[in-house]
Amino acid sequence: MIITVEMADLSPPRGTRDFLPEEKLLRNSLVAALQKTFEKYGFNPLETPALENYDILASKFAGGSEILKELYTLEDQGKRKLGLRYDLTVPLARVFASQKLAMPFKRYAIASVWRDGPMKAGRYREFTQCDVDAVGVSSVRQEAEIMALTYAAFKAAGLDVFVKVNNRKLLNGLLDFLGIPEAKRVPVIIELDKLEKIGAQGVLKELEAIIEPGYAKEALELFTELEIEKSLRVVEGMALGEEGKQGVSELKEFYSSLEAFGVPDGFAVFSPSLARGLNYYTGIVFEAFLKESEGSGIKSSLAAGGRYDDLIGKFSRAKEKIPAVGISFGLDVIAEVLKEKNAKLVKTSKKTVVRVLVVPFQNYAYALKVSQELRARGVACTVDLDGKSVSRNLDFANKQGIPFVVFCGAQEEKEKKVKLRDMQSGKEELASLPSALVKLA
């Protein structure tokens, strides 16, 4: 059956979106603010392909079985199996393992990723991640620096957030304390990570499918109690094994470093059930959420990450351990929050990049000369090339949010002037070309 244009569904694939200029400009301004923050902290840009070899994405060192359920796969004409990247961390690991890069290697990447998973407010199947990662630093001071960067980034965006913090070593230590077998810990961790999302009874049901009901109930009770306390002192007093104690020690050092980085008290909150779903995390993990004071209906995390000391080394032939830590900001969900709260960033957003509409009065040569002069001074402008009426041009400028209109006729050319209209005030003036250029630049 031949599909004609008339028969085709013109909407984008489910879970993807088109961004019209007004929204795209908002997103661009948010990206620019994030890039500025990332670079202030010494992170450099890196770009990788949207497509990766399937073996890289499906590697046991990569995201794990949960994420593979959401992987988009395809074959090229050479029958090679490929996949769309589901995050920007695995491509970073591949690049670092295949290149001779000096450490510490601090990079940021801003790009689309794809996951064929469930959708909800602020969550899509194609979405943009804004990642920062530092490779080659084993000290938890690196986590503290990333926390400072996170605080600065959300402050620049005008959002009041807090970050949940935990340590996978402590989490493993708590599961060991409960007597949960090592082989069962990864699926148990995945379910505990859902405590706030599906509630205690939902988690209990899932845990009972993995471990004995008695263990499941005991685990749920312990983590529920610890979540209420949210105190490192409580877990520090428990009879934990070596791994658990190391997790506590790292968290204490992390918190003591935050003050030196200028991170205020209460920004990073200890959350003992926080696990992060991806298997490659090895140490401190974190996840950022809006504070209730924002009054948003969006409950999804805005950023998340952690330490993954084993991932990059296992991609390399030498198989050495290479310390790494990073965080990923969700551009889409942050943009949704900003729109929802009608923040300053949205109020000042514009519909177009155009600053000046140049209108010829049957004098295209002069109008084009003026437009080129404007562009030479860095002013974005567009020219009416269709000979529309004055009223139609003014209506267009008003609808598009173009702040100025310049009229160029034979008389204006003769006097080496232009008629300049301020669309906000409605005032018009006849100005010399040099003075108009200065005013518009």
PLM regions: where:
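Auxiliary tRNA-acceptor-end handling modules of aminoacyl-tRNA synthetases
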Residues: 5-24
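Positively charged, Gly/Ser-enriched RNA/tRNA-binding surfaces
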Residues: 23-41, 52-53, 69, 87-100, ...
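Acidic, His- and aromatic-enriched active-site or binding-groove loops in soluble protein domains
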Residues: 67-76, 180-203, 290
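A generic structural motif
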Residues: 164-165, 188-192, 381-390
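Short, conserved phosphate-binding/catalytic loop or strand-edge motifs used
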Residues: 124-130, 165-173
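Polyanion/phosphate-binding surface patch
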Residues: 50-82
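Short, positively charged and aromatic/hydrophobic N-terminal segments
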Residues: 1-3
